[in-house]
Amino acid sequence: PSAVLAKDGKNPSDAKKYLGKDAAEKSGVAALEYADVATLKNQIASVLTFLSGESKIADNPNKVAKKVESVSDAVGAICDNGSALEISCDEAATKTYFAYADGAPVGVLSVEGELTCKDFRKIKRFVNLLDAYNIPLVSVVDSDGFAARLKCEEKGVAKIAAEAYTAMALSENPKIAVIKNAIGGAYALLAAKEIGFNY
C-alpha cells in the first residue's frame, strides 16, 4: 500500500484514507464487514456452509407472507427463517445475498431503483460467483431500468451493461424472477424468459 501511495505522490500516513475500508467498499473488493473477529469467524463459517450446500435451517416453504411492500420484505419472505446474508454491502440499487429457500442454497439479487454502472458490475460479479458454485439465482425486481444520466453514458454504461447481460445469458444455473416492476433493461436482464428466467 505505501508503494502505491508513494507512486501517486500521496503521503503513506494517509493509507487508511486511500486504501482502507471505504476504498475497498467503493472498488467492490470488500464483500463483508464486521466489527470484531468473533463475528467475522462466525460469518465466514456461515458462508462456507452455504457454499458447500448444507442447511440446518428448517422453515415451511408454503408459509404465507404477512406483509410484503418492498423488495427487502420480499427477500425476507422468500428466504428460510431470515437466512439472507447480504454480501458486498454498498449504496447501489442492487443488493446481493446468500440465503436458503426450502433448505436449498440460493443467491438472491434484489434491485430497487435505476440501474447504474455500479449495479451492472455488481450483478456480473454475483452471477459469476453463483456460477462457480452451481447455485440457483432468485432475482427480486422493482426497477424502471437504466439510469438515463449523462454521467452514466460517460462511464460507458452500455459496455458495462453488456458484460452483465453476457454473464447472465451464459449462466446455466436455474433462475427465478419475482417481479414488482421490471421495465426495459431491468426486465431484459433480471426477469426475461429469453435470458433464462422463470416466474
Regions flagged by a language model, labelled:
Residues 1-199:
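Ligand-binding clefts of soluble mixed alpha/beta catalytic domains
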